[in-house]
Amino acid sequence: GAPASAAQAPLATKLAVHRRFLADCASGASLGELLAPLSELLHDPGAPQLTFALWVTLFPRAWAQLRTEEQEALVKPLISLLSKEWHVRQASASPNVVQGWLQALLACKPMPKIPAAVLQYLGKTFNAWHLAIPMLEHHALLYPNEPQWYDALSALRTALGERDSFCSLWSRRATHPETRLALALEQYGAWTAAQQAYVDCMTRWQAGETVLVNTPRAELQLWEYGVLRSAKKLNQWELLSEFAKQTQQPQLLMECSWKTSAWDLLKDLFYKYSLPDVPGIKMLQTYAAIHEGKLSEAEARCNDGIQFALQEWCGLPPLGVQSHTPLLQMFQQFQELQESAQMLMELNNAQRVGSVPDLSSILNTWRERLPNTWEELPAWNDLISWRNHMFSHINNVLGRLAEVPRHAEAKPGLASLGYQEMVWTVVRFAHVARRHALPEACINIIAKLQSVSTGIAAVDLNDTFSKMREQVRSCLQMPGLVPHGMQMLSQADIDQLSKPQQAELFQLKAELLLTESAEAADNGTAEAEAATAHLATAISMHGALPKAWLLWGGWCDRTFRKGGDVVWADRALGCYMQAILLRLDRARSMIPRVLALLAAAGQ
């Protein structure tokens, strides 16, 4: 006890001295003496957070002391102050003056009514998304009949990439159930159906239907943008190009021009229109410069584009949002443009000295650096379109080099190297389109590839199997094209394929026949029997084909359910177990059914 008391005595003495010091300051100091050090701290460049916090605390309290008419009189000067151009110089700083003003206004009660367009501009320009959006939501609740609040909210949500919030906002705001249906289809990724729904709305409105004739202008624009957005997702660039020409949208026409290889049109658009300094335009200018072989100009445009993209990145919220994804994809495209310029230099040097360039490092990197499977189709299309352009250029140069006998003997596949890379990449693109439940886009992608590869020996390309598999699987997703898939497989020359590939084609035939059997009015007995024959052929050719085992097991299981013959239960059990042993993910979901079949076989 004594040591503790001894230790507490000095502490009590120090606290008493400090208490007397504070009392002397409070009794003898004037207001000026208190404000002087505070003013010095507030003007310290190293303490912006203190200034920001003090302003946000004091201004709402001062605002609350004003009378209603005084508050209303101050709104117009506030709007004028927030709209001053000199604030832009501080846009990249955090915190900045505009953020301080908006956070203080957000805490005011009642909140001043700042116009929606001003809040939208301030939120986007000064990285004040988290302040502008709550203010817009507050005013939208107070003034539900004023559409400008919803327009600004929609614009900010779209800029942040929050498609679900955008669709939710419009679902509450839309005046027609047809609009809500189109938005729901879009949210679920059913882009073909969503596009058709938007087109139907526009067609009915143009026809003057009474239900849609009084549609608000904002909703009409939503339909139009919905059609364009769906067309981009579905890779319909020819359609978008025609629309851009008719509606005089130069930036959309520029985007379509390079993707459809209309380089002359793209160059004319650059000279015809005044272009903003945004990363997307700089990327298009880099594409055009590399296409024309102007590598120095391409490097300058690319560097400018990267700087503008970094500025946009700094203008986004610090937390990860969906709008970061397009910028990351843009950085990858700029990286590949730099690598494209490097490849052009190597190809030019190879033509000058007559040697074979070594492009394997960059080409292997491109194979490994594809977008993720779940990324949206436009991100894939941007990369694949440019890569295909480079592959065509590579093939033209290597084709000329392959005419030299010593090069042709050293590298027999030199002339078709560009086509091999193109085919592999485009087939991968088609596969992703099919996985996104966009079979029409998959078929169109393969069709364009076939037009490019006409006249190239299939043995050099080694793409027959991959293209056919993607086309047939797309037909499986579109029941109306099942006969087309059967015709394609029947006409295929499979002798050059390996045994596992031949077995998989027989399995695909069985899948098509089972699909026909399920839709047939007479239960499709003939198609089902033919399907089992093809499955037996596939398994006899290549036993390690788990999906064939699963399909066969499913057919045996359905036969057992219909007739009750335990023999079919035994066969289904064996097929399911074999598929599980071959580690097919889908087969694991059949384990409960396997247990049920074991019980049935035991009885």
Identify the residue ranges that each predicted region occupies.
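Long alpha-helical scaffold regions
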Residues: 1-170, 174-603
